[in-house]
From Swiss-Prot:
Keywords, ordered alphabetically: Chloroplast, Plastid, Ribonucleoprotein, Ribosomal protein, RNA-binding, rRNA-binding
PROSITE patterns xrefs: RIBOSOMAL_S13_1, RIBOSOMAL_S13_2
GO molecular function annotation: rRNA binding; structural constituent of ribosome
Regions of compositional bias (Basic residues) in chain numbering: 102-123
UniProt-recorded name of the protein: Small ribosomal subunit protein uS13c
Biological-process GO terms, alphabetical: translation
């Protein structure tokens, strides 16, 4: 099992898709990293040699991106700042409602939680 930046990569996936398990790396940046590390895109995670793993680790450290814990902390601080300045987006985050203008009269179930049933009117 390959471990990069504190993340265990899945065993039998192509390396480009395995790198997307690292928070902050999408498929496009994963392909660029693989290209810079001079690794074939068809290589599976199990088939990586130690030299290739070291090359991947070096590329991940050399790119100027926030990854994993740093990125999560950065996003958390941004949400905390929105809450502190009491703006509309901060209030939506605080109340666990959709932030980007989606409707809430119907839908938005994943953000608002499961349905709260109300008993019907008795006759």
């Amino acid at each position: 099992m390959v471990r990069l930046i504190g993340v265990d990569l899945p065993r039998n996936k192509r390396i480009a898709y395995a790198l997307t398990y690292i928070h902050g790396i999408g498929i496009t940046s994963a392909r660029k990293i693989i290209e810079l590390a001079e690794i074939s895109p068809e290589t599976r995670t199990d088939d990586l040699t130690t030299e290739q793993t070291i090359a991947l680790r070096d590329q991940l450290e050399s790119i100027d991106l926030n990854l994993e814990g740093d990125l999560r902390c950065f996003n958390g601080l941004n949400i905390k700042r929105l809450n502190e300045i009491n703006c509309h987006r901060g209030k939506r985050h605080r109340n666990n409602l959709p932030v980007r203008g989606q409707r809430t009269r119907t839908n938005a179930r994943s953000r608002r939680g499961s349905k709260k049933t109300v008993t019907g009117k008795k006759k």
